[in-house]
Each structure stands twice: as C-alpha cells, then as structure tokens.
C-alpha cells in the first residue's frame, strides 16, 4: 500500500500494523490502490467521510480491531471478514473500514514468508502452493 513509518497498532494484539501514506488520498483513489496491491475479487467498505492518510492493516479477520485503529488516529483499516455491525460502528467513529477479502489480505505476505524461511533455514526449499487461491466470488447484480 506504500505506507511509511509502519509500526505496531496499540491494542492490535501485535498482528495489526499502522502507517501513513506519503499524502492524503480521497477514498476512491485509496480503494483503487488497495485493489491493485492486493488483487481482491471485490472490496466491501464503509466511508469514514474523511481523506485517508493514516492506515491500519491486518491480514485475515482483523475487523474487531477497528476501535483500536480509530483510537490510534487511523483514517482507515484494511482487513477482511468484517461484520455488518463493525461497518456501522466504524462509520459512526469516522473510520473507513475496508474488507478486501481474507485470501488477498493474507496471501500478500507469502513471498516474504518464503524468503524468510529460506534464509532462516539454509538448505530448506520452500515452495508456495500452486493450488491455494481465492475461492470467494462476487455476483454483480444487473
């Protein structure tokens, strides 16, 4: 996503990170950036109705950390498996909550993990699965 000054999100159970964009972005532009970075089949979101600059990210089901993201001064949280009530509550806090899909938000780390394991365990061949892929599809209502 091009975040700078990435750090642990307080209250994020050490699995959610936060950082800032080089410049504030309008929501449509940020959604496009998320789409290009993660390659989801679709994006669900609620609009916090403010420009996006400070962003929290949590791979997989980290929607429950939206309050921590808002308390940490974030404008948006990018994660997956967000519940409807979380969207409502995030919007009430002025936080843009983005559900980019479970697979896309976790799969993005796989190349980094492969390199880490290969470096950590010299001589170990690490192979990414060729069959593990996104299984969720979206039907576009005509």
Model-assigned labels for residue ranges:
Residues 1-142:
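Hydrophobic structural segments
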């Amino acid at each position: 996503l091009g975040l700078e000054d990435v750090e642990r999100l307080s209250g994020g159970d050490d699995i959610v990170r936060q950082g800032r964009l080089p410049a504030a972005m309008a929501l449509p532009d940020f959604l496009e950036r998320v789409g290009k970075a993660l390659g989801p089949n679709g994006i669900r979101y609620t609009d916090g109705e403010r420009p996006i600059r400070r962003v929290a990210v949590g791979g997989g089901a980290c929607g429950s950390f939206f309050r921590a993201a808002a308390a940490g001064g974030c404008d948006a949280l990018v994660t997956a498996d967000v519940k409807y009530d979380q969207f409502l509550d995030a919007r009430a806090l002025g936080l843009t909550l983005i559900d980019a899909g479970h697979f896309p938000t976790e799969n993005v780390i796989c190349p980094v993990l492969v390199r880490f394991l290969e470096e950590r365990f010299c001589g170990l061949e690490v192979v990414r699965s060729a069959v593990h892929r996104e299984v969720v599809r979206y039907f576009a209502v005509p």
